[in-house]
A protein has these predicted regions:
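C-terminal segment of classical bacterial N-terminal signal peptides
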Residues: 15-23
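Electrostatic cytochrome c docking/interface patches
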Residues: 23-34, 124-153, 247
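The canonical Cys-X-X-Cys-His
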Residues: 31-46, 113, 117, 148, ...
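Extracytoplasmic electron-transfer domains, predominantly the class I c-type cytochrome c fold
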Residues: 56-102, 107-118, 174-241, 336-338, ...
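Acidic/polar low-complexity flexible segments
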Residues: 249-274, 330-388, 435-519
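Beta-strand-rich interaction surfaces with strong enrichment in secreted/lumenal proteins
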Residues: 301-304, 413-419
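Short, well-ordered beta-strand segments enriched in hydrophobic/aromatic residues
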Residues: 311-318, 424-432
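Exposed beta-sheet edge/beta-hairpin loop segments within beta-rich domains
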Residues: 415-422, 440-444
Length: 521
């Protein structure tokens, strides 16, 4: 008699799970092969987020055994749908080491690896989760954006994200994820780096669902409690989206220095900079030269350039959550030191200054620039180095990261620096022709000169080697447009019109002459 209930239970389980289990059982071996090849190095053989590379990553890789996922269309605390998992695998997670796999793996491989990932957690054996209905965004306007800002303040979003949305709120230095690892509040001015998407709808969905495993909560309960309305939460999403450019910034290889007939800007806040185009330069962690750095705080710098025919001015701006050194960020530094001690030795126990380096080929017209990480002893780079404490800029020769010799003699550079609402703005100015052309490049109009950038956040444990770097780009000084460029088209139009009028009049005279000589037609 005892065997009959067991048989019935087995039959019931087979009826309930049979079709789904058969699909999963078929997919899992194929998914395991994909996972072992492409995923286990970070996420670990058993999906616990403990792969051999995990110590080099912050945030740490996802622990699939916990069943906790940030990017979902489901309610807070629920599992993601298969579509949610597929989205993250396809697109990756900006700001983390997780890349998108759309171009690397086939559709079938991605579906197979989803089935295998789900096998790591017992929570996926239940009913499939369902996405919440978020409706559609209401129309926007200046008044709607202003209302969004008001609700942003009401919900105290500024405590983490800051008054201006730079991720520099008073709580920002204390933020940790569910695994007690330090985690940055998002910079709301860089929507192209938002996890889960950058549209108003994507942002609203994150507000409704939260980012499980992080300090970012769901605000669905605030709506349910009638503290705010659903429309007001949409307004917050619209306000947040308004802080970023409409389109992700295009990365261009050439920075054009605008030629001005007026005086060069007096500093980074000078309104004259409105006439110079801003170029976005992405930065990545310096992971080539030891000590390497896998957790940079700065991911991009905006560069503007202007010259007046005798001097060149560069304006550089980047988000920085602190003006280092800042005692409010001592707790953050302690957590970063604990999290990253396995990577090429410990960080400094106290904060250093914020740093900026702009490097050039030492001579104009070189076909190949030096090594992009500060040059080398064989081929040095010319470098401008700025520090926040003390606020100073120096030009000199670099023979590698952290290997810098300042120029002797009178200073060649002038500068002005400004820290405003979580953003550094630095202007550096120099004569086009340096005092010593054997050690520093001349800036020649109508000729591109290689240029590269390095930024370090002292509050994040960064220094002259541990920081964020760019590839080589080029700065090109515009030339005055010759008068003939403006005059020649006008003259051509006048000559063409005059010639056309002359031909018409000649044709009319011939026609009248023909009529007189042949009056009967």
């Amino acid at each position: 008699m005892s065997s009959r209930p067991c048989c019935l239970l087995a039959i019931g389980a087979a009826l309930f799970l049979g079709p789904r289990s058969s699909v999963l059982l078929a997919q899992e071996p194929r998914g395991k092969a994909v996972y072992d090849k492409w995923c286990a190095g970070c996420h670990g053989d058993t999906g616990a987020g403990d792969g051999s590379a995990q110590a080099f990553m912050l945030p740490r890789p996802r622990d699939f055994t916990k069943g906790v996922y940030q990017i979902r269309t489901t309610a807070s605390g629920e599992l993601p749908t298969d579509v949610d998992l597929r989205h993250v695998i396809d697109e990756g997670m900006p700001g983390t080491a997780m890349p998108g796999w759309r171009e690397r793996l086939t559709d079938a491989q991605r579906e197979d690896v989803i089935a295998y990932i789900k096998s790591f957690s017992q929570f996926f054996t239940g009913a499939a989760p369902t996405a919440i209905d978020v409706g559609s965004a209401p129309g926007t306007s200046d008044e709607a954006i202003a209302e969004g800002r008001r609700v942003y303040d009401q919900l105290e979003c500024f405590k983490c994200h800051g008054q201006d949305g730079r991720g520099d709120g008073t709580s920002a230095p204390t933020l940790t994820d569910d695994w007690d690892q330090p985690i940055f509040a998002a910079d709301l001015h860089a929507s192209w780096r938002f996890n889960g998407g950058s549209s108003v709808e994507d942002i609203y969905r994150r507000l409704r669902t939260g980012l499980d495993g992080t300090p970012m909560p769901s605000f669905s309960d605030v709506i349910d409690s009638k503290i705010i309305t659903d429309e007001q939460l949409w307004r917050v999403a619209q306000y947040v989206r308004s802080l970023s450019p409409e389109e992700p910034p295009a990365v261009r290889e050439v920075i054009r220095a605008h030629l001005t007939s007026e005086s060069l800007p007096s500093g980074p806040a000078d309104t004259a900079w409105a006439h110079a185009e801003a170029y976005y330069i992405p930065l990545v962690g310096q992971i080539i030269v030891k000590p390497r750095w896998f957790a940079p705080a700065v991911d991009g710098v905006w560069v503007q350039a202007m010259h007046d025919g005798s001097r060149l001015a560069l304006r550089l701006a980047w988000t920085d959550r602190s003006r280092s050194p800042d005692p409010a960020w001592d707790e953050w530094l302690a957590r970063i030191r604990a999290a990253m001690t396995d990577v090429d030795g410990p960080l400094a126990s106290s904060q250093g200054p914020d740093l900026l380096a702009v490097q050039f080929s030492p001579r104009s017209g070189e076909a190949e620039p030096p090594f992009f990480l500060g040059g080398s002893t064989r081929r040095p780079a010319h470098m401008w180095r700025w520090s926040s404490a003390p606020d100073a800029v120096t030009s000199g020769t670099a023979t590698g990261l952290g290997q810098f010799t300042a120029d002797a003699g009178a200073p060649q550079l002038t500068h002005a620096a400004r820290f405003e609402k979580g953003e550094w703005q630095v202007q550096i100015t120099r004569a086009l022709v340096p005092a010593d052309t054997t050690r520093a490049p001349s800036f020649v109009t109508a000729r591109a000169l290689p240029i590269a950038f390095f930024v370090a956040d002292g509050s994040n444990g960064e220094d002259a080697v541990r920081g964020a770097v760019s590839a080589w780009y080029a700065v090109y000084l515009d030339v005055a447009t010759p008068t003939r460029v403006y005059v020649a088209p006008g003259l051509t139009m006048l000559l063409t019109a005059g010639l056309g009028l002359m031909l018409v009049r000649q044709a009319q005279r011939r026609e009248r002459s023909s009529e007189r000589s042949n009056p009967e037609g």
